[in-house]
Structure formats: C-alpha cells, structure tokens
Amino acid sequence: MTAPHETMSFQAEVKQLLHLMIHSLYSNKEIFLRELVSNASDATDKLRFEAIANPSLLENDADLAIRIEADAKARTLKITDNGIGMSRDEAIRNLGTIARSGTKEFFQQLSGDQQKDAALIGQFGVGFYSAFIVADKVTVETRRAGLGAEEAVRWESTGDGEFTVDAIARAERGTTITLHLREGEDDFLSAWRLKSIIQKYSDHISLPIRMPKEVWDAEASTYKRTDEWESVNQASALWTRAKSDITDEQYTAFYQHIAHDNEAPLAWTHNRVEGRSEYTQLLYIPARAPFDLWDRNHKAGLKLYVKRVFIMDDAEQLLPGYLRWVKGVVDSADLPLNVSRELLQESRDVKAIREGCTKRVLSMLETLADSEDEAERAKYATFWQQFGQALKEGVGEDQANQERVAKLLRFASTHNDTAEQNVALAAYVGRMKEGQDKIYYVTADTWSAAKNSPHLEVFRKKGIEVLLLTDRVDEWMLSYLREFDGKELVSVARGDLDLGKLADEAEKAEQEKAEADWKDVIERARAVLAGKAKDVRVTLRLTESASCLVSDEGDMSGYLQRLLKQAGQKAPDAQPILELNPEHALVKKLRDLPEGEAFSDRLQVLFDQALLAEGGMLEDPAAYVQRVNKLLA
C-alpha cells in the first residue's frame, strides 16, 4: 500500500542547525558540494559492503558513480548516486532528525569563526543540511536497494522547520538531491566552477564523479553540453597509488575528507607492507584534537578496506586506545570480505596490522620530536598540546613500546619558568647534577601549585631540577613508569625522600641534632594529631615554609586520593605525615607553649596550612578560620 503524503516537523536541534547554516556559514558556501559528494560516496561504500552478502542489491548495475548536473534554466543543481538509497522510514529518520547524542556539544563547539565552524559540520555528521546554504528548497528522491520501484520516496523542505514526504516511483536505485538555488547563487550553475570545487575537495573520491561533457561551439563562442558524461576526478583510491604520484595537496585533501577537518594534518605516513600480513596503510596525525576525545562514546579508529572494498569506519582494533586520535585508512589483502568487529578481535592478521600501524605512528612522532628543523619540532609541540595526555596512556597500555613512548613524553619543569610542557626525560637526565641518580617530580592540580609547592624548597636551594606534573593521567602513568634510562622516578613528596650523594654530611648531622632537640615537642604533636596524621617530625627539606605533608612509603599520595574521590571512586584512607621546619618562627613558638589549647591550635593551623599548600580540602574550614584569627589577635 502506498504511504500517503505527510508533512512533518524537524527535530528542534535541526531547526537550530538550519538557522546556523543559512545565516552563519555564507562565506564558506562551497562546502555544501563537498558534504553532499562525501555522503554520496558513503552511500556507494555501504552498497558495496551489503552486496558482499547480498549481490542482488546491485540490480545488474555495478558501475557505481556520482553524477552532478546543473540546469541553468530551472536554476537547479542535482547530485545523484546509485548507492544504497533510503527507505521512507530512513529518509524521515536521517533527514529530519540528528540521531547522534552530540548535538549539544556541536553547538557548544561553534566559535563564530566560519572556517572552523564549517569543519564541524562534517565531524558531526550533519553535512546534508549545508545544502540550505545555497538552496531555498531541497528535494530528495531516493529508493533503497532491494525495494521495488514503487517504494521510492520524495523528501522536500524549504528549510523553514517542516518537510514533506511522498511516495513515488523510481526505477533507479540510489538518491538524487535537487537543490533549488537561492537568488544570487548562479555561480554554482557554472560547470567550470563545479569542477574546480570537486577537484579541490573531492578529487580523491575512489569512484567517478561525472558531469555532462561540454564541447566548444566556435560559431556561438561558448561551450555546449553533449549527451555524454565525463569523469571530473581521479576516481582511484589515493592509498593505492604510488607515493611519487601523489602531491602534498592531494594527501591533505584526502585527510580533510576522511577526518572532516578543514585544517591540514601535522604529518602522515603511507606504506605498503608485505610479509606475514599484506596491507597498505595511510595514517595521519591531526593538528587539533576532536571535541569528544575524552568521551567514552567517542568513535575512534581507522577506515578498514579489504581489497579496496569498504568494510567499516572506526575500526578501533587497528590501533591501541592511546592512539585513538590517529586518522587514516588500512586496506588489507588478507582479511575476508565478510569480516566482523568480533572477528577483528581474534584475527592474527589484525594483530600484525595493529603492531605495524603503532610502530609507524610512533616513528612519525619521533621524526617530528627529534628533527633538527625548528618547524618540524614546532609541529611536535602542537601535537603534544593537543594529544599529549592521550599519549601518556601508552606508558601503561603498551608495554612493548613503553620505552619509545616514554622518550616522547614532555613535562613542565623548574628548569623553565613556564607552564609549557616541553621538557623530555632525556633532556632532564642530560642536565642532572653530579651525584644525582634519580629523576624528581611533584604532582599538583595546577602549574602554579606545583611550582610553589613547599616540597621544592630544598631542591631549589641545591639547584636540582624537578618535573612539574599537573595532568590527571600523570599519577596513573607513574605507577607504570618507575624508571627512565636506569634512573628511578621519585616524588619529592615522599616521606622517605633520600637525596643520596646530593645531601652532605653536615646536613645529615644537623637533621639528627634537630630530631633530638625537638623530641619532646614532636611527641606532644603526635598525641594532638593522632587519627589525623600518621606521624609528625622535623625536617630540613623546608627552607621557607613552616610545614608540609608527605606520604609514607607505599601509601597513596594525597593528590591521587583527591583524584579518585573526584571521580567517584573509593580511595584508601592513608594518613599523611606532617613535617615541621624547626627554623621557622611559627614552629619555634611551639617549644614555648605548654600542652593545651594554644599548642593544639597552632599545630592544627600548621597541619591545615600544609594541606592547603598541596591543594587539599579542609574538613572544617570554619574551625581553621577561628584558629587563625586567634593567632592574629
């Protein structure tokens, strides 16, 4: 039974999106053709894939192509593909709603910069709506492969918040999108203009894009259209061509197509691998992190082809999780055409591809990081700013390549008076003082908190460099990265901190004397802070601050405890050790105070100040304020 004519309303987010397209992206009008051609290409990829299991879907028409035709009299532009097509329900769902959950994020990402916003359209899978930038009415006629000719559908909208759906007859499988151009958009009726846009954005599309052939009419001094169709793009899969035949511009255009990104990539690698597994890889390092890099539902992974037949997007099994930001294509000669995601998990060939792709990406990063060319090193700095935290995950996730990943890590450090993470572990080791056999670091919520940590005072005094770690992933990473180049990584907030040869004999003697002189005060302090501090002791690691908190050997740091609690996870209740600076005026007064409220209040203030200095939260801020006020009175 033929479905009736229906008028339906767009989803609210689509209305908002249409308004954006029409009113905010007018200076990037030509992107509409890029997006519609990309969608048409995807439709043919889907048909190829479904036809593997059901060849009848090809309907005796295996010559897959995209046709673009302008009609100057009617002022229309048609984009036709003979791909998978859509059923009535699919047309309503795909063209009337935004299915994905990222709608809110899409609008939050909009910056007002038209070029950047235009790139987001493709990233969010809403490229179809860009047609309304140049058209005041859009008509879509489509029939899904496998359905009868009478089961085709016409979808139409003027972009005003509603669309109509009608049943029609259509002999051809696939989709035709007709754009009824707005006044002033006649530029897009020019064959030359359309060809230039196609060659700019879509030359790499692996199926032919055809337009009516035009020949020069000398009498009329103009080009005239013929009944023939000609291909206006290369129409071959870029990765199958020889590297020497591909320009940087073509590599960049292909990246922009698969990544839906207007920016050029930082680097790429293109290789044909032969051996146990035979495959071609074309991998890119983007210049900017996607908005949802840290979203659990983020779709990551490479495009997978088998013998040039598209199999799936987002084949996350081809790269480890810490490289989820890599874009590109893998074309395997060994995998079966009916490969499933489940089969990918178990395949030995996929394991070999994964290992090979991982090594290639790490090699690209090493080339940028170690380059003598300042521009290349600047690219690595850009990469690190965008993806450094993700790369740190590799220290724990990829034991086989841990050493290579560790060499690529960058940190802020007391060597530079800047929050920029630009210090490599190898550079730190190269600057170590004579007698130093450890790499020292401090963790904190912010660079300022790390730089001003009381734990750094003795290191500043001795001129010892300390790494300043402020990323949430750092504590987790350090649980796997115990040493580098034979040097142990040690937190300056450890209670059992041993400077080894960096501490002279006089300092050791002074420490022993202080412990003896303050024995009585320390015993009283331990009694006051019982249940709050694991221990109280004097220290010479402080030169300016009155007190600091340190963690006992084997205990979780206060910083990591806070991170776990913020993430809603249970953290072990490890009490810190309070260390007091015996040379500080606030601490010296403890010796003159008898047991009682005044002694207890001053000691509690010293504990709370140390907790605040390391970024901790007070259990009772009001009590702290009262104690401080007493001291100030």
From Swiss-Prot:
Function: Molecular chaperone. Has ATPase activity.
Cell location: Cytoplasm
SMART domains assigned: HATPase_c
Family annotation (PROSITE patterns): HSP90
Domain of life: Bacteria
Principal subcellular localisation of the protein: cytoplasm
Name of the featured protein: Chaperone protein HtpG
GO cellular component, one term: cytoplasm
Subunit architecture: Homodimer.
Alphabetical keyword list: ATP-binding, Chaperone, Cytoplasm, Nucleotide-binding, Stress response
Organism, scientific name: Cupriavidus taiwanensis (strain DSM 17343 / BCRC 17206 / CCUG 44338 / CIP 107171 / LMG 19424 / R1)
Pfam family, one: HSP90
Family: Belongs to the heat shock protein 90 family.
Alphabetical list of HAMAP family matching this protein: HSP90
Annotated region (C), positions in chain: 563-633
Gene Ontology molecular function: ATP binding; ATP hydrolysis activity; ATP-dependent protein folding chaperone; unfolded protein binding
Residue span of region A: 1-341
